[in-house]
Amino acid sequence: MRFPEFNGEWEKKRISEFCTLLKGTGISKDQLSTNGNPCILYGELYTKYKAEIINEVLSCTELDANTLVKSKVNDVIIPCSGETAIDIATARYVPFDDVLLGGDLNILRSNKVNGSFLAYQLNGKRKYDIARVAQGVSVVHLYGEHLKNIVISLPVIEEQQKISRLLHLLDERIATQNKIIEDLKKLKSAI
C-alpha cells in the first residue's frame, strides 16, 4: 500500500538498528489501585488493550514511581511471556509519557521510527517472525535478545505516520461497526 506522494524503496533494518530494547519492572495485579500512577501490566495486552494503539491507560498503582520504568511517547510494548508463541507476538503502541510499565514487558524505544507504525507492522507481517524466536513450551518467553534481529521494512517517517493514521482510522471504523452489530444482536434477541 503506497500513497501517491511517496516513492522509493522501504529500508530493511533489524530492530536493534533503530530501537533501544528495555524491560519493564515488577508491578503485580494485587498492587493495582483506583488511584495513583497510570500503569500497564503484561496480561492487560491480552485482555484490555485489543488495538495496536493504547488510547487510554486503564490501571493505576500507588507504588513509588521512582523505582519503576516509565514509558516515553512512541514506546512499543510486547509481552515477555504468554501461553503460545503466536499470542506473545502482540505489540502495542504507548502514546503517553510516564506510564509505569510492568515487569513482564519488552519495551522498544526509538525516536527514529513512528511507534504506531512499528506496532502495526509487528502485529502484521512480522508477527510470525516474532513467534518463531519465542522460546518455551508450556509457557513461552520472549526477550529483547530475541527481538533485536527481527527485520522491519521502513518507509520514510512521513509515510510511516500517514500509514499508521490510515490504519488507526480503519480500526476506529471497525470498532464502530462492531458496536452497531452488537446493538443489533441485542435488539434482535429482545424480540
Question: Which residues fall in each region the model found?
Answer:
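A short glycine-rich beta-alpha junction/loop motif
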Residues: 99-105, 135-158
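Short, solvent-exposed linear patches
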Residues: 159-162, 187
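Non-catalytic DNA-recognition/assembly elements of restriction-modification systems
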Residues: 2-25, 149
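Sequence-specific dsDNA recognition surfaces
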Residues: 16-29, 43-73
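Short, well-ordered beta-strand elements within core beta-sheets of diverse protein domains
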Residues: 2, 62, 106-110, 149-154
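Short, ligand-facing micro-motifs at secondary-structure edges
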Residues: 46-57, 76-101, 115-120, 128-132
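Short amphipathic coiled-coil heptad-repeat segments
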Residues: 1-8, 176-191
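Hydrophobic structural patches
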Residues: 1-4, 162-174
